[in-house]
């Protein structure tokens, strides 16, 4: 995955703060993608990526459940860009077993990462949620959605070491899932996609419409700090 930039010659642009400057991220490709735990079955094409999950793969660290699961495949790029958004559409039509999931990830190391996905639960509902792991402890924020939802868009936005995760049903109107701080996410980072099946199951996760944009998460201009 590669980003090529065209820099505006103006010193500032409407809606951009001074630290951001004015950078247009133009070109997105799959060159430069790197696996953390390469799966046995996958496909990387010009317009889609497919991952067939393997049973008993997962990401979680310590909190509540006490186990440390760190074997899900993650496909990522590296960047030092401090302000950008990453968008992807996920199709998980083949999922049908508890905890089957696929979505976006920013995996720095086993104890510092985030992810967002839909986790299948049963024929009635599934969990749309996100996990943020800082210094070895995961949290999980979720909401229940109908089990017949089979696609979801995600947008991950970065503002230095702060991040915003959003989701969308149509790829046009995005809703905030969470805002978070990554203690180790202020410099060079890795981010991309993941898929896994924590129990004894497998499904094909399909990722399309991957794109980079200027940071869609604008600087805060509301209430001033005390």
Predicted ranges, named:
Residues 22-226:
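Extracellular glycan-recognition regions
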